A protein has these predicted regions:
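N-terminal phosphate/diphosphate-binding loop that engages ATP/GTP or pyrophosphate donors
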Residues: 27-96
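Hydrophobic positions on the alpha1 helix immediately C-terminal to the Walker A/P-loop
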Residues: 20
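Walker A (P-loop) ATP-phosphate-binding motif of ABC ATPase nucleotide-binding domains
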Residues: 6
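ATP-dependent NMP and nucleoside kinases share a basic, alpha-helical "lid"
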Residues: 93-168
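Hydrophobic anchor at the beta1->P-loop junction of P-loop NTPases
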Residues: 9
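Small-molecule kinase domains that catalyze NTP-dependent phosphoryl transfer to phosphate-bearing small molecules
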Residues: 66, 77, 122-129, 136, ...
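Conserved lysine of the Walker
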Residues: 17
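The conserved Walker
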Residues: 13
Length: 228
């Protein structure tokens, strides 16, 4: 087996990482892997099995005892033209975007054993695949030797509106609550002891605050084509 080309995309929550990664993957015919979805799937498992809840966030450590019961896979959905995530054989692409998962995922993602469990799976995907992988530690931990590293940023208000628009049931929360949650997640992601979110020295920073999708992708594809 050979390792393919790797494009690593990191950044804070709701900066548009996955949208950018999907677009690059389609353009280059690479495999797209949303690692944030993998952490969300583990979090969803914890909720479904009554291991963690809003009132018992710190119980997330108990999920470590159930990792051998968790199988995460990606399958291509032709009608949506994207890879979708499956948890133990069930499509959970929509369920992992719920506010309950959003509020708990950072507590799950900071646990070293869970990160190691998922990082190993992420590295395996690079064998015999050219991939675009987005997350928070792709360039720094998962693939420090990636062929190209991008770090995506965006204004907090823009990010909050983007996340709010993604939610199917907006009655669950308000825009201001979403923004507060994002800021809290930023602090958790940057401050965790294991694999904190950092911008690598060799990463190219892209601001996705107030730019059209067309202009953004034209700029990014120029960078990609010069590096890959």
């Amino acid at each position: 087996m050979e390792k393919g080309k790797i494009i690593a995309i990191d950044g804070f929550s709701s900066t548009g990482k996955s949208t950018i990664a999907k677009a690059i993957a389609r353009e280059l015919n690479f495999l797209h892997v949303d690692t944030g979805a993998m952490y969300r799937a583990v979090t969803l498992y914890g909720i479904q099995e009554n291991i963690i809840s809003e009132n018992d966030k710190e119980n997330a450590l108990q999920i470590v005892n159930h990792l051998d019961e968790i199988q995460i896979t990606f399958r291509y959905n032709e009608s949506e033209n994207q890879n979708e995530i499956y948890l133990n054989g069930q499509n959970v692409e929509n369920e992992i975007r719920s506010i309950s998962v959003t509020n708990l995922v950072s507590y799950v993602a900071k646990i070293p054993e869970i990160r190691s469990f998922l990082v190993e799976q992420q590295r395996q995907l690079a064998w015999n695949h050219n991939i675009v992988m987005d997350g928070r530690d792709i360039g720094s931990v998962v693939f420090p030797q990636a062929d190209l590293k991008l770090f995506i940023t965006a204004d907090a208000q823009v990010r909050a509106q983007r996340r709010f628009n993604e939610m199917e049931d907006k009655s669950e929360t308000t825009l201001e609550e979403v923004k507060a949650n994002l800021i809290q997640r930023d602090e958790l992601d940057s401050g965790r002891e294991n694999s904190p979110l950092v911008k690598c020295d060799d990463a190219i920073e892209i601001d996705n605050s107030n730019v059209s999708q067309e202009e953004l992708m034209e700029n990014i594809m120029r960078i990609v084509q010069s590096k890959i």
